[in-house]
Regions:
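Glycine-/charge-enriched secondary-structure boundary and capping motifs
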Residues: 2-15, 19-21, 25-38, 177-178, ...
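N-terminal amphipathic, basic-rich helices that act as targeting or association modules
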Residues: 4, 8-80
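Alpha-helix N-cap/helix-start motif at coil-to-helix transitions, marked by capping-box chemistry
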Residues: 16, 243, 655-658
Length: 784
């Protein structure tokens, strides 16, 4: 394709532009664009780059705070962590590429998010991920899991950055669109942050990193479209990563910054050279002129269109200070990187591209950068689920005799095990009878079976198979990771007593049932997870994953989820400093469950005071912080045991969240607690089982809160923590809880080798561990 080729509305549509958008281009230019210019417009106006459907609503987020140095709008967010140091972090999606080509899609997602962080002057110190796959029985799921996990581990391990936390879910709603959200956290000096805005005209523009190839062309456009049955044909739009080149790029970039030569810098991510050059010039209010013949190329005969839209990985664009080209050349040569001066900033306000002696693009930057189309799309209020009365939700049965483990559990090593539900009832003494238990398999399910089934379900079961493929301890600063029994990863700030706590969270089934409450809960759970390791929650990044925003019901999910998240951020003093929006996650008109993922960072001033849920000791007292109502709507129990996905999610009272979290954090700082676990999926009984397994100590609960036993044990009420403390600390707890006005309930004690509730069940730790550890390896090792 040449610059002389005629552009048509059909070509614009092929590039992802709507007819009204093409008409807008004609009006702005007062002429027809050539194919190169049209390609530039198409990627800069894509949903992926412009946020044209969501930008109106993203403004609801609070983005400032006492620790915020830089909020949304740059490559990543920056927060102050004291002592002249800053934490730089962001989360971003690589959903569409990972479905098409799972290994490279996931690997380049990791590489891209690291570049966002070190582009601002930070050394990456931690990686996280949030993964959503389809139903385990779907024919593509196992291959996608294998490829994505290998890609994440293969890239992060080679670069030498530990993967310390994350979450993995399975649901049929992701059969046609998996989600791969990657997060990176880095450290920098607070007074040495680098930004992307070009400071003035007349400065050299330098390309460095890997050569440009034809991989990833129109990747940003592909990420702004839904899939259909021909999705595999989009494989050429997936980028190919080289982690060893990334490692060299990190070192060269940080050395270049330390030399004082950098005036502005931007990585080449989505839309490649187009977005990096347009954003740098646009933010600085200058023009930019590039000589594409000077761009390092790994393939012959590349056109201007291909070079501008390529998304080849491990590339950077820098604007250097006057006369500093030689410094850059020396550093790039040292690290073996391709590099060239490919242009300059100008006073014209135009994007000018030259190739083979011709001007192949000459368009104003304004409509590309700050005058892209913005839509106020129509939306409708989501249809909400009614609240479920826990007394009307079936309970497990006592089974034969006492119910103390009398029936064998479902075979947890069956890799294609579908959750089973059964028939009978059980109530606590003070609750009305519950209805018969309608198990889909037609068999009665006991308490023992229900608990083992939940522990072995794909969303809860140990992901050891997965995280053992990640290097969690490279850099030697990891204090808590996926293996240590904690609600958040914890990484030491090297050479100090400080540590950063990091987590990623979302409960899609809550957002599906009520986007507003689900949005609040995603933020609140991230806040709880940081609290549960002893950290002060500071700020969040987000990754908003939704379907097609042109459908009013999907746009309604987006609007209300953002509303809920924004309210939670304000109430918890938890500003949003960076983020990403991934839309059009649907195939043949079937959208994913709405998944607004939250990545969060907290600070421990003394990492010696960190805590997890694996420190339980025999004789410790188990205490539940927070009130128990027994909310079973949209719960894991309802889905995995009863085969239902209905009911309103548990409501989130943000004032109560803050009160209870502040109480727990204060108790941790006083050194009173042995173990802390926030309550989430599966409620109290799963939190107790996970604490017992991590600590290798049993628990016995002989005094449950009031209510139907199954609602008390499986209910997912929010703002709750399970804590363990010595007997002699109870008086201090009572005083602190009284001062805070926070309810608590003494449940029982630690000891023995069972998880037991008086008069209901007792399950040996070995059986619990077999259920918890068995599903994932059995699934991944099963024949295809």
């Amino acid at each position: 394709m040449t610059a002389r080729a005629k552009t048509t509305a059909d070509l614009a549509a092929e590039y992802g532009l709507k007819p009204e958008e093409y008409a807008r281009i004609l009006k702005r230019l007062n002429r027809e664009p050539n194919p190169v210019e049209l390609g530039v417009f198409s990627v800069m106006w894509s949903e992926h780059c412009s946020y044209k459907s969501s930008k109106k609503h993203l403004g609801k987020f609070p983005t400032t705070g006492p620790r915020v140095i830089c909020g949304p709008g740059e490559n990543a967010g920056v927060i102050d962590i004291d002592d002249g140091q800053a934490c730089i972090f962001k989360m971003e999606s690589h959903n569409h590429p990972s479905y098409i080509e799972p290994y490279q899609g996931a690997a380049t997602g990791v590489g891209g998010i690291m570049r966002d962080v070190f582009t601002m002057g930070a050394r990456p110190i931690a990686l996280l991920n949030a993964l959503r796959f389809g139903d385990p029985s779907h024919p593509k799921t196992r291959r996608l899991v294998s490829g994505v996990v290998a890609g994440i581990g293969g890239y992060g391990n080679c670069v030498g950055v530990p993967t310390v936390a994350g979450e993995t879910n399975f649901h049929r709603g992701y059969d046609g669109n998996i989600l791969v959200n990657a997060m990176c956290v880095g450290l920098a000096d607070a007074d040495k942050i680098f930004y992307s805005a070009a400071p003035s005209a007349g400065l050299p523009v330098v390309y460095f990193g890997s050569k440009t190839g034809r991989d990833g062309i129109h990747g940003a456009t592909m990420a702004s479209q839904e899939f259909d049955d021909a999705s595999d044909e989009k494989r050429p739009t997936v980028q190919v990563g080289d982690p060893f080149a990334e490692k060299l790029l990190i070192e060269a970039t940080l050395e270049l910054m330390a030399s004082g030569a950098v005036a502005a810098i931007q990585d080449m991510g989505a839309a490649g050279l187009t977005s990096s050059s347009v954003e740098m010039a646009g933010k600085g209010g200058v023009g930019i002129e590039l000589d594409l013949d000077a761009v390092p190329q790994r393939e012959t005969g590349m056109t201007a269109y291909e070079m501008m839209l390529s998304e080849s990985q491990e590339r950077m664009l820098a604007i250097l200070k006057p006369g500093r080209e030689a410094d850059g050349h020396r550093i790039f040569e040292k690290w073996g990187l391709d590099a060239a001066v490919i242009g300059k900033t100008t006073e014209t306000g135009q994007l000018v591209l030259k190739h083979k002696g011709e001007t192949v693009c000459d368009i104003p930057l304004a409509p590309l950068f700050d005058d892209a189309p913005l839509y106020d799309r129509p939306w409708v209020e989501p249809v909400l689920q009614p609240r479920l009365d826990p007394a009307h939700v079936p309970s497990p049965s006592m089974g034969e005799g006492s119910g103390l483990g009398v029936n064998a559990p479902t075979d947890v090593n069956d890799p294609m095990r579908r959750t089973a539900s059964s028939a009978s009832l059980e109530t606590s003494a003070n609750a009305p009878p519950t209805p018969p238990f309608p198990h889909r398999g037609g068999r009665e399910m006991t308490w023992r079976q229900a608990i083992l089934t939940l522990l072995a379900c794909p969303d809860v079961a140990s992901k050891r198979w997965l995280w053992e493929q990640y290097d969690r301890h490279v850099m030697a600063d990891t204090l808590h990771d996926s293996a240590t029994g904690a609600d958040a990863g914890v990484v030491r700030v090297h050479g100090t007593k400080k540590a950063l706590a990091v987590t990623s969270d979302c409960t899609p089934r809550y957002v599906q049932a009520d986007p507003y409450e689900g949005g609040k809960q995603a933020v609140a759970e991230a806040w709880r997870n940081l609290t549960a390791v002893g950290a002060d929650p500071i700020a969040i990044t987000d990754n908003l994953n939704f379907g097609n925003p042109e459908r009013p019901e999907i746009m309604g999910q987006i609007v209300r989820a953002i509303d809920g998240m924004a309210e939670a951020c304000r109430a918890l003093d938890f500003p949003v400093v960076s983020g990403n929006v991934s839309l059009y996650n649907e195939t043949n008109g079937s959208a994913i469950p709405p998944t607004p993922t939250v990545g969060a960072v907290g600070l421990l001033s003394d990492y010696a005071k960190r805590i997890g849920y694996g420190g339980l000791k025999a004789g410790d007292v188990l205490v539940l912080i927070g009130a128990t109502v027994g909310e079973l709507g949209s719960s894991l129990y309802l889905r995995e045991i009863l085969g239902r996905e209905d009911g309103a999610p548990p409501p989130v009272d943000l004032a109560v969240e803050k009160r209870n979290g502040d109480l727990v954090r204060g108790l941790i700082r006083k050194g009173l607690l042995r173990a802390v676990h926030d309550l989430s999926d599966g409620g109290l009984i799963l939190a107790a089982a996970e604490m017992a397994l991590a600590s290798k100590v049993g628990v016995f609960m002989d005094d449950l809160p009031e209510g139907p036993a199954h609602a008390v044990l499986f209910g997912e009420d929010q703002a709750r923590y399970l804590i363990a403390l010595p007997q002699d600390a109870l008086d201090v707890l009572d005083e602190a809880a009284g001062d805070a006005g926070a309810p608590y309930h003494v449940l029982g004690r630690a000891g023995g080798c069972e998880v037991a509730v008086k008069d209901l069940f007792a399950i040996d730790l070995d059986d619990l561990r077999a259920a918890y550890e068995g599903w994932m390896p059995a699934y991944m090792d099963a024949p295809a």
